[in-house]
Each structure stands twice: as C-alpha cells, then as structure tokens.
C-alpha cells in the first residue's frame, strides 16, 4: 500500500514539473532535439519533414539536407 501511495505522489510531482515548463520553451526544446539549425537553414535529415522555421527538410544527398520552402 505504501508503494502505491509513493508511486502516486512521485507521478504527481513529475506531472507538476512538466506543467511548469512554458509551451513555447517546450517547443524550442523539441526543435533543438530535432537538430534544426535555423541560422544556416540546414536540417537534420532524421529530424522529420519540418525545420524550425516551418520549412520542409529536403535531402539533397546522403550527406546534405537543407530547409527549403
């Protein structure tokens, strides 16, 4: 019984910490994880179909991907 109560308390604490992060900051963290580099418009081919600026990631070759409109 103590283990269940402890698990519920820990879950509530984790949820409250997640809610404390603003949505915009969370989006910035997510974009950073995708490997988006908006300053030079390069993107990580493994990051998915979008770049930080909303452009699409186009794989030009095996080693080169760019954010294109």
Curated annotation (Swiss-Prot):
It holds the Pfam family Toxin_7. Keywords: Amidation, Disulfide bond, Knottin, Neurotoxin, Secreted, Signal, Toxin. One of its GO terms (cellular component) is extracellular region. GO terms for molecular function: toxin activity. It is found in: Secreted. Its main location: secreted. Expressed by the venom gland. Residues 1-20 form the signal peptide. The keyword Signal applies. Disulfide bonds join 36-52, 43-57, 51-67. Residues 21-34 form a propeptide. The modification Leucine amide is found at residue 68. The presence of a 'disulfide through disulfide knot' structurally defines this protein as a knottin. Insect active toxin causing rapid but reversible paralysis in crickets. No activity shown in mammals. Does not show effect on mammalian voltage-gated calcium channels. Belongs to the neurotoxin 01 (U2-agtx) family. This is U2-agatoxin-Ao1c.
């Amino acid at each position: 019984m103590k283990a269940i109560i402890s698990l519920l308390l820990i879950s509530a604490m984790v949820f409250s910490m997640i809610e404390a992060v603003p949505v915009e900051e969370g989006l910035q963290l997510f974009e950073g994880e995708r490997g988006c580099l908006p300053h030079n418009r390069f993107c990580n081919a493994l990051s998915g179909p979008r770049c930080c600026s909303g452009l699409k990631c186009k794989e030009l070759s095996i080693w080169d991907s760019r954010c294109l409109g």
